[in-house]
């Protein structure tokens, strides 16, 4: 049993040594670390999603904002003069949807 364990350890050591030697022989041009931190625009756009402009709110969403804003008299007054979106944004922050 000890002989089997010794042979397994020796074979693992041999595999590790040969795999380290094969990875060290790559040319410098294939190393991604040498490319730097800048990438082309088309490659970067595949990784980072662009923010989209907010779409049009539906009547149900606007009614929901109106119901929240009606509970505050100042918000309700601003809603009548400036509009529901401006009033909600001023008193409650960005629209959640």
From Swiss-Prot:
Similarity comment text for this entry: Belongs to the osteocalcin/matrix Gla protein family.
Residues at which Ca(2+) 3 binds: 70, 76
A cellular component term, taken from the record's GO annotations: extracellular region
Family matches, as PROSITE patterns: GLA_1 (PS00011), GLA_2 (PS50998)
Record note on modification: Gamma-carboxyglutamate residues are formed by vitamin K dependent carboxylation by GGCX. These residues are essential for the binding of calcium.
GO terms (BP aspect): biomineral tissue development; bone development; cellular response to insulin stimulus; glucose homeostasis; negative regulation of bone development; osteoblast differentiation; regulation of cellular response to insulin stimulus; response to vitamin K
Domain of life: Eukaryota
Gene this chain is encoded by: bglap
InterPro entries for the chain: GLA-like_dom_SF (IPR035972), GLA_domain (IPR000294), Osteocalcin (IPR039176)
Binding site for Ca(2+) 1: 63
GO molecular function: calcium ion binding; hormone activity; hydroxyapatite binding; structural constituent of bone
Protein name, per record: Osteocalcin
Bridged cysteine pairs (disulfide): 69-75
Residue positions where 4-carboxyglutamate is found in the record: 63, 67, 70
Keyword Transferase: no
Organism, scientific name: Sparus aurata
Binding site for Ca(2+) 2: 67, 70
């Amino acid at each position: 049993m000890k002989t089997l364990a010794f042979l397994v350890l020796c074979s693992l050591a041999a595999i590790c040594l040969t795999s380290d030697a094969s990875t060290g022989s790559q040319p410098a041009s294939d190393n991604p670390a040498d490319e730097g931190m800048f990438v082309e625009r088309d490659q970067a756009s595949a990784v980072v999603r662009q923010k989209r402009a907010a779409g049009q709110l539906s009547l149900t969403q606007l009614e929901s904002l109106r119901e929240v804003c009606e509970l505050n008299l100042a918000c309700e007054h601003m809603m009548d003069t400036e509009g529901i979106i401006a009033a909600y944004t001023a008193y409650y922050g960005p629209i959640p949807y």
